[in-house]
Amino acid sequence: MKKLKVIVCGSTFGQLYLKALRSSPEKFQLIGILGTGSDRTLRCAEEYNIKVYKSIDEVPDDIDLACVAVRTAAFGGNGTEIALQLLEKGINVIQEHPSHPKDMEMCYRVARKKRLVYHIGNLYPHLGDVQRFIKCAKYLNNEDRLLYVDTVFSSQVSYPLIKILQLAMPSIQGWEPQKHVEGGKVFQVMNGRLGGIPICMQMNNEVVPRDANNYMHLLHKITFFYTGGHLTLEDTFGPVIWHPRMFIPIQTALAGTLNIRFPDNVYQNTGYILSNRNQNKTFEHILTAVWPEAILQDLYH
């Protein structure tokens, strides 16, 4: 199988792409990094023993794939421009979100014209607890009835949220906004129906311009309410929890004593953690292992 010759554009989040690509030498040949020539870029090039390209003109014509991890125009960066120029050069592109729909449309048009692949990178559906949540939701969708969806998320990861919902809900066809509630500076709230299911979307719509990747209150928290209980992805990195719906038969309340044998359902736990309890949850582990592995899985797809 031919190895794909790959370059990475950007040396901030791009470092995760570098590690992901280096971990799969049988599929990818890491050629170089496109950057401004900063000290960080030079250190990355030295660590991975690759070339530094300071302009797209310097990038070889035989590159198969460029991973663009540079802020897009939506966040005041030139990532969109870089992606367009690479596509015009005949190179397939995977680009990190968030990106404005109009910018994505421009890139898709060029990719189609050139018969290339343009893909928005999305590592989140490949995270272990996200996959576990999706698997559990699919099972419950077949065994029970999804009644309501509650989501809390940061605006920077709204694109991955939609993908997670697409994979976990019976359908997301048809969006019917019903009410928008101003929640102050921290969260904005929107209610509606997605795929015919009532949904509440609470968005942490704050971005610190000097450091857009930080200061988010959370990434994702998602709860699916069913007839028999609710399933929650407590955080993007877990845990996944199932809470059975509390039901105490009226006969129990009328017994006149609590010293009785309750119905079997009363002996259920109030919640069940469905994640690996021993999973390492440090931010260091997420940064150096979890995210690069998820990026690699996204590249495989």
PLM features: what roles do these ranges have?
Residues 48-110:
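Beta-loop-alpha module in the N-terminal Rossmann-like domain of NAD(P)-dependent dehydrogenases
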